[in-house]
């Protein structure tokens, strides 16, 4: 029992010592949001009550986290890439930031500018977002 208490005490001291060497991030963490209308910011004009969940998301954080919502109505993973929207987001990402991805509703539409195939091009686009974010 004494041996276990000593081990726990040593572990806590080691954690305390290590935490002194962890560099604090000076900039806030940014959560980038990419997706379709389900996530997008909506106009508040003319009594519109519709909101994308990404529009409400910043209210759950302190000033240490910035939410940068790039989701747009009517976009698929394909159109988001082809319109250059992904390149804009990618150019802003720094180590320690996050990217939340929410596509699918428009990827299933038959229009060539939107359509992707599950298990093929849709998956490829999602992998691209993840791999390029990690790079």
Which ranges hold each PLM region?
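Bacterial N-terminal signal peptides that target proteins for export
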Residues: 1-10
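Alpha-helical cap/lid subdomain in secreted, periplasmic
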Residues: 2-3, 25-26, 85-135
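Short, solvent-exposed loop/turn segments at secondary-structure boundaries
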Residues: 43-47, 79-82, 112-117
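Serine-esterase "nucleophile elbow" of acetyl-processing enzymes
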Residues: 22-71, 88-92, 99
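Residues in and immediately flanking transmembrane alpha helices
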Residues: 18-20, 49, 115
């Amino acid at each position: 029992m004494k041996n276990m208490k000593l081990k726990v005490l040593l572990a806590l001291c080691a954690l305390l010592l290590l935490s002194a060497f962890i560099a604090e991030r000076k900039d806030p963490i940014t959560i980038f949001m990419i997706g379709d209308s389900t996530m997008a910011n909506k106009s508040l004009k003319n009594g519109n009550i519709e909101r994308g969940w990404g529009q409400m998301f910043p209210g759950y954080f302190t000033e240490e986290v910035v939410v940068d919502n790039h989701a747009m109505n009517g976009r698929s993973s394909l159109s988001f890439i082809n319109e250059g929207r992904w390149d804009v987001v990618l150019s802003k990402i720094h180590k320690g930031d996050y990217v939340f991805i929410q596509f699918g509703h428009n990827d299933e539409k038959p229009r060539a500018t939107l359509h992707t195939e599950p298990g093929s091009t849709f998956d490829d686009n999602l992998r691209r977002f993840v791999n390029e974010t990690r790079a």
